[in-house]
C-alpha cells in the first residue's frame, strides 16, 4: 500500500515527518514557500515519484521472500498455467504475473488538496503560514480554523466535480508512474484502491492534515469511500463521485463502503433519498 497522504504531508513540510521530525524526503519547500498551487503539485509529484522508486525494490524483496518461505501450492493449483508448467505462482508460473499496489487514500487526498487550493491559493482566506503551523501543532488552539477547513470547502463524495477530479488526477499520476516498472516475474504492476482495515494504521502514521483531520486518526475507510460524515448529498452523489475514478484506476480492485441503518429504508422518504 502506498500512502499518498504521507507524501502530501512531507511535501508540505520540507520533506520532514510531522510525527518524528525525521527528514524522509527531499526538501522542495513547505506550504508557506510555494508561490502557487501548481508549484505545490510539482513538488508533490517529485516526492511521489521518489517514494514509488523506493517502494518497487521493497515489493520485489517481499515477493522473492515468498518463493523461499511461503510457496502457495493450493493457490497455484487453481491459477491458469501453473499446473501445466509445474511452477508455483510465486515463481512466475501464472499466465498473468501481475503485482498489485494500493493507492491510499483518495478521499483524504482530494479533500486536503481542495482545502489548500480554495482557501490558501484561490480565495486567500487562510494564510499558508497559519495553516502550516496548525498542522505542525495538531490544530492546538486552532479549532475555529479546523472547522473552517472541515465545513467551508466541498468534499469528495458529494458529486462536486472539481474536488473529485483532484483525487482522480493524482490517482492517474500514480498509475502512470507504476507503469514504468515490471515485477521480477516480468508482469505489470496494477493499481488498486482498497485498505480493508489498513486505513486505521495508515492514519496512525500521519500527522494532522489540511482536510481538518487530527493527527494519527484514521483515514477514510474502504479505498474509494468518502471520509466519515463528509458525504452530505446522499448515496447517489457518492456513487457519481466514485464513478469519476474509472475502472482503469482499479485493475487490482477497488472498495467502496456504504453503510445504512435499517431504519433508513422504513419510510418512503428514506427510500427516495
Walk through the language-model features, giving the residues of each.
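Acidic, glycine-enriched catalytic cores built around paired aspartates
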Residues: 1-273
Amino acid at each position: 500500500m502506498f500512502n499518498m497522504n504521507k507524501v502530501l504531508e512531507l511535501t508540505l513540510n520540507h520533506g520532514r515527518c510531522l510525527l518524528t521530525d525525521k527528514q524522509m524526503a527531499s526538501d522542495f519547500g513547505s506550504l508557506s514557500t510555494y508561490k502557487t498551487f501548481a508549484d505545490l503539485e510539482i513538488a508533490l509529484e517529485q516526492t511521489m515519484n521518489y517514494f514509488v522508486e523506493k517502494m518497487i525494490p521493497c515489493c520485489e524483496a517481499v515477493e522473492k521472500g515468498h518463493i523461499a518461505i511461503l510457496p502457495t501450492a493450493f493457490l497455484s493449483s487453481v491459477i491458469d498455467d501453473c499446473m501445466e508448467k509445474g511452477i508455483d505462482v510465486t515463481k512466475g508460473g501464472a499466465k498473468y504475473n501481475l503485482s498489485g499496489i494500493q493507492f491510499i487514500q483518495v478521499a483524504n487526498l482530494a479533500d486536503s488538496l481542495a482545502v489548500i487550493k480554495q482557501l490558501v491559493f484561490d480565495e486567500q482566506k487562510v494564510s499558508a503560514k497559519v495553516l502550516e503551523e496548525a498542522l505542525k501543532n495538531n490544530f492546538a488552539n486552532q479549532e475555529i480554523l479546523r472547522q473552517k477547513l472541515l465545513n467551508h470547502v466541498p468534499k469528495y463524495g458529494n458529486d462536486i466535480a472539481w474536488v473529485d477530479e483532484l483525487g482522480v488526477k493524482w490517482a492517474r499520476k500514480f498509475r502512470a508512474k507504476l507503469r514504468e516498472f515490471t515485477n521480477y516475474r516480468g508482469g505489470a504492476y496494477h493499481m488498486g484502491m482498497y485498505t480493508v482495515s489498513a486505513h486505521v494504521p495508515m492514519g496512525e502514521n500521519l500527522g494532522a492534515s489540511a482536510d481538518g483531520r487530527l493527527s494519527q486518526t484514521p483515514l477514510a475507510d474502504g479505498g474509494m469511500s468518502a471520509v466519515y460524515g463528509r458525504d452530505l448529498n446522499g448515496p447517489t452523489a457518492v456513487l457519481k463521485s466514485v464513478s469519476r475514478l474509472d475502472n482503469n484506476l482499479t485493475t487490482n480492485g477497488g472498495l467502496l463502503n456504504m453503510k445504512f441503518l435499517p431504519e433508513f429504508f422504513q419510510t418512503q422518504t428514506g427510500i427516495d433519498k
